């Protein structure tokens, strides 16, 4: 069963996205990038994020969408801002695509590296290795989005 999966790593400065094709345990990276969010008012930043997501959905169709849940942060303002971005993303995905899967950062790290407390660099190393890529993927927002898509692909194989 050949599935096209969109993985998203939401952020308030950059939102990483990755498109993989998953088929019988083999995953192929189709595209990965960033939705860049310029410093501005929160309303305009959320608008930029949603417009970037619109563009991705206009250029591709997906069987599955997966998004990383927000991480715990010590700064309440940061948590609130990330929650607003994530809420806007969730609504946009529901409007365009419908249901989507959610994974915590710990679930993603565990699925990709085998360790829930892995560093971002360890995740990046394993993403590169799992996809058989020769070049490093930068920035880490993109690597995280790929990891989300890979986590969802693995989760689907377990459920099928």
Curated annotation (Swiss-Prot):
It catalyses: Endonucleolytic cleavage at a junction such as a reciprocal single-stranded crossover between two homologous DNA duplexes (Holliday junction). It is found in: Cytoplasm. The active site is at residues 9, 68, 141. GO terms for cellular component: cytoplasm; Holliday junction resolvase complex. One of its GO terms (molecular function) is crossover junction DNA endonuclease activity. The gene is ruvC. Its cofactor is Mg(2+). It comes from Campylobacter jejuni subsp. jejuni serotype O:2 (strain ATCC 700819 / NCTC 11168). Binds 2 Mg(2+) ion per subunit. Homodimer which binds Holliday junction (HJ) DNA. The HJ becomes 2-fold symmetrical on binding to RuvC with unstacked arms; it has a different conformation from HJ DNA in complex with RuvA. In the full resolvosome a probable DNA-RuvA(4)-RuvB(12)-RuvC(2) complex forms which resolves the HJ. Its EC number is 3.1.21.10. It is an enzyme of class 3 (hydrolase). Mg(2+) 1 binds at residues 9, 141. This is Crossover junction endodeoxyribonuclease RuvC.
């Amino acid at each position: 069963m050949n599935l096209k999966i969109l993985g998203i790593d939401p952020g308030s400065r950059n939102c990483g996205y990755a498109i993989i094709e998953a088929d019988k345990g083999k995953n192929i990276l189709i595209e990965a990038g960033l939705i860049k969010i310029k410093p501005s008012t929160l309303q305009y930043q959320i608008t930029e994020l949603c417009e970037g997501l619109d563009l991705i959905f206009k250029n591709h169709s997906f069987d599955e969408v997966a998004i990383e849940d927000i991480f715990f942060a010590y700064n309440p303002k940061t948590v609130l801002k990330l929650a607003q971005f994530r809420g806007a993303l969730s609504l946009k995905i529901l409007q365009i695509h419908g249901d989507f899967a959610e994974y915590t950062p710990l679930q993603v790290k565990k699925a990709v590296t085998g360790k829930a407390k892995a560093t971002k660099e360890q995740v990046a190393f394993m993403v590169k290795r799992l996809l058989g890529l020769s070049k490093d993927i930068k920035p880490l927002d993109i690597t995280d989005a790929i990891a989300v898509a890979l986590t969802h692909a693995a989760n689907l194989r377990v459920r099928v």
